[in-house]
Amino acid sequence: MTEAAKPPTIPELEAQERRLTLPHFTYDDAWAFGNLLVELARRRCAPVAVDIRRGGQQLFHAALPGSTPDNDAWIDRKRRVVERYGSSSYLVGCRFRAKGTTFEESSRLDPDKYAAHGGAFPITVEGAGVVGTVVVSGLPQVEDHALVVEALEQFMTRPWSSS
């Protein structure tokens, strides 16, 4: 995202979530998607950690040069927001700010365990709903979110098999 680019609006974020729905999400899909996300991050020399889960199981994790253990802590906090609200962590934070408050002030959730900062996105499967999460941590929150969305958009253009 360039400095001139505006952060997405709440309606744009909601539209992203409706549009980025997968026909299925298998172990092989998680591996392919994780590798695509890592490749996009490497091209940018982005110092990020990446985490993909389905249900309670971690299916993919990578830490790129420049990332730190703190990024894994942020991943956990952002992931919990998606699991609780069923929406991207960035959208949840934006909704609180639109009400004139912050997630930390008004959610009544422990900020050591939950963070409504951009970078965590629901993995949604047609006919099943939210089945998992993809999380990136290491960039400013708008950029973490944008990287996940870009990767999902590219991932969805691939031919789908029955795997």
Curated annotation (Swiss-Prot):
It comes from the Bacteria. InterPro entries: PduO/GlcC-like (IPR005624), PduO/GlcC-like_sf (IPR038084), YBR137W-like (IPR010371). Pfam families: HbpS-like. Belongs to the UPF0303 family. This is UPF0303 protein SAV_5210.
